[in-house]
Each structure stands twice: as C-alpha cells, then as structure tokens.
Amino acid sequence: MSSENVFERLYSLKGKRALVTGASSGIGKAIATCYAEAGATVGVHGTNDQKIADTVESINGLGGSAVPIKQPLASKADSETLIARAVEKLGGIDILVNNAGTNRREPAIEVTEENYEAIMSVNLDCVFWLCQAAYPHLKKSDCGKILNTGSLTTLTGIGGISVYGMTKAAVGQLTQTLALEWAKDNICVNCLAPGFIRTPLTEAGLFSDPKKVAFLDDRIPMKRGGAPEELTGMALFLVGPGSSYTTGQTFAVDGGFLAGGSWLDRE
C-alpha cells in the first residue's frame, strides 16, 4: 500500500467542479488553489479583474485548472447569475464554497442602514440564494458538497462586529438546516469557522496594530494568527470523498482560541 492510495481515497478532487466565491485573494484564494492542486477544476469568483486574473494565472501556473468568473454579488439575481455562469464555464457544479464576505467594525449603536444591508446582503442573503440556485446541479453530483465560510462569531460573541456576527451565526444555522433537508439528495453541507487569519484585509485592519497583535498572541494558545493555507486541510477534507458521512457541522480552525483561556500566568 502507498500513502498516495490513501490520499486518492480520502482527498482527491479529480473530475470535480468547484465554485469558490471571493476566491481572488486571502482565504478564498488559498482554498481555490488547494482544490485545484487536488484535481478539481475551479471557478475563481471575484469582482476585481486583475485579482481574478492573477489567481487564475497562479493556479494554472502550478498545473491546476481554473477559470475566471467576475460577477457582482449583492442580490438574489446576482446569485442566480453567478451559478448559471459557473455551470456554463465548468459544465456543472459538484462543490460550492460560499466564501465571499464583508465586514464593518463599529459599535451596534452606530450601525447605519447602509452598512447593515451591505453586510447582510453578501454574508447571509447571497449565501442562501447561491445554495438554492446551486441545489439542482449539486443534486446531479454523486455527492454534492457545500462549504460555508463562517467565523469565530458562528460559535461565540465578539464585540464591535454585531451585524457581521449575526450573519455568521445565521450561516451556521443555515448549514444545519440545509444538511437536514438535502441529505436525502446526498448533498453534504458544512461550515468552516476560521480564527484570526492573516489576509490582505486583516493585515491592514487588525495585524497592523501592535496592541491588537499582542492581545491575540496572548489570547490564542498557539500565540499567533493563522495563515490562509492553514485552513485548507479542513477545507479540502470537507469537500472530498473522505467526508461523505459528515454533514451539518461547523469546524473551527482557530489555533485553540475557542478552547478557552487559562487562569494561569502564561510563560
């Protein structure tokens, strides 16, 4: 026996067609790259032409197969159009990764209707509509997979991001509901809850602040923020053949953050 046989049996995505939203940078780019390396043909969704092109070029340069899909994502119509374009370019959809998202850091009392709608539309509304539009295509797959990107706020509260946290908690609930409704169609639906991950977005707004970095280094048991690539092992498992009996679950990849804190002095 060889380790290659184990990989093929549990993790190979050969012949699979995956749509990853928000795939032109950060976590989405890492997931799209990983899936292509595992053998999938990946639809790289985004809204920035250059970032999409760079990601597609990077994946194809590694010997993978990726196609660009530029599409606004803020409504039911946008969601349906995106799925239709992905099916046209990929020939179908076996895997849907709902990764696109946005955030505004502000106290709940200061949230405006504009900011509220901007966060809700991308983080929650479009996740629902994308799943609904993709369902007929996933049903045709031998084992369709949906992976929703949640957050620590899917599982716990964090101040200053009330609307964002609300959407991610709802995504966790949606994950369970769809898992229950679509298990009969052999569609598995799971949620990935990243911790504090270093991406272009968080580098500018979080990891550039020495005080916040010091807090995270103290609070996270592994004493550092994570890299997008450190999410890809779980992201691959949850859409691969090895997770064919895993559905309705949320998996945190957070360096131990949600395990709790210690009352002992840190060394």
Predicted regions and their residues:
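Active-site helix of classical SDR
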Residues: 131, 167, 175
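Alpha-helical segment proximal to the catalytic Tyr-Lys
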Residues: 136, 180-184, 244
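Short C-terminal tail/terminal secondary-structure segment
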Residues: 2-9, 156, 236, 247-267
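C-terminal substrate-recognition "lid" of short-chain dehydrogenase/reductases
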Residues: 90, 128, 224-253, 258
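Conserved glycine-rich cofactor-binding loop
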Residues: 17, 24-25, 48
